[in-house]
From Swiss-Prot:
Its main location: cytoplasm. Keywords: ATP-binding, Cytoplasm, DNA damage, DNA recombination, DNA repair, DNA-binding, Nucleotide-binding, SOS response. This is Protein RecA. It comes from Campylobacter hominis (strain ATCC BAA-381 / DSM 21671 / CCUG 45161 / LMG 19568 / NCTC 13146 / CH001A). Can catalyze the hydrolysis of ATP in the presence of single-stranded DNA, the ATP-dependent uptake of single-stranded DNA by duplex DNA, and the ATP-dependent hybridization of homologous single-stranded DNAs. It interacts with LexA causing its activation and leading to its autocatalytic cleavage. InterPro entries: AAA+_ATPase, DNA_recomb/repair_RecA, DNA_recomb/repair_RecA_CS, P-loop_NTPase, RecA-like_C, RecA-like_N, RecA_ATP-bd, RecA_C_sf. It is found in: Cytoplasm. The keyword Glycosyltransferase does not apply. One of its GO terms (cellular component) is cytosol.
Amino acid sequence: MDDNKKKMLESALKSIDKAFGKGTLVRLGDKEVEKIDSISTGSVGLDIALGIGGVPKGRIVEIYGPESSGKTTLTLHIIAECQKKGGVCAFVDAEHALDVKYAANLGVDVDNLYVSQPDFGEQALDIVETLAKSGAIDLVVVDSVAALTPKSEIEGDMGDQHVGLQARLMSQALRKLTGVVHKMGTTVIFINQIRMKIGQMGYGSPETTTGGNALKFYASVRLDIRRIATLKQNDESIGNRAKVKVVKNKVAPPFKVAEFDIMFGEGISKMGELVDYGVKLDIVDKSGSWFSYKDKKLGQGRENAKIYLKENPKVADEILAAIREQMGSESLSSSSDDDDIKEESGEE
């Protein structure tokens, strides 16, 4: 850069600093690149798929899928992981459907969870903004976007037309929230539902999410969760197999996929993930229906292998450490999965 341009740039920088405060505009080479911190999802596979060991801090995240696919279960696991690291969490229950007992079963410290059940959408989003601005909250979950009904719609009559009201509400709220959550390091997770596009013909997915397009743009991470199978034992349903696709990821490569078991009343099965990823990475040997690790027989059949790992947390810890080492994720090594293994096995 020639001297004349350099003087002009220095003059412009001084003017900007004077008008908006020192450090408003900085050269990236003069500033240390900040590592993006994360909150574990409670699933080893999903943490790996997200690339940074979980959902990013200080960002907006959207988790969407059909009914009973595991959206709320996944967010409750994220809350539990955040609390284990000393984080303060809030749950904005716009659907008025939070099951406190189930949340406790998943490891959520319900006594220290802040819960709000707002009357209308504007109130819910104002609460989220106030919590984020406080700088004291690490994670806010909104369940769900579809339930954020504008005040004018609630106060109106049945059958009244309210075209685009919710989309405008979300667009305005997200414009205000994005900068605040980044500055304060608060993660905001929006749970969303799926609707079918009216009159969809030809190419493209017939599905869309509620609340307009704003959330699609402002979210740093978007997770699509689906139930792909029902898990049965002796003809009795004991859980679901879930598949999560990272549809959008601004902090790591997108389009990664993770699968895990969600057991009824228990949530994500970490032992199931250890078996699956252990086999995938050749850490656990599978010969026919038998699973083994080193010289130890884990059991015949996947369910028996999971039971063995529950009863032998030291073996589970070894397999988890080997998975982390092979996947090469530094952020995973600081997650609290070891504690989860001990909890799932019943060890104190």
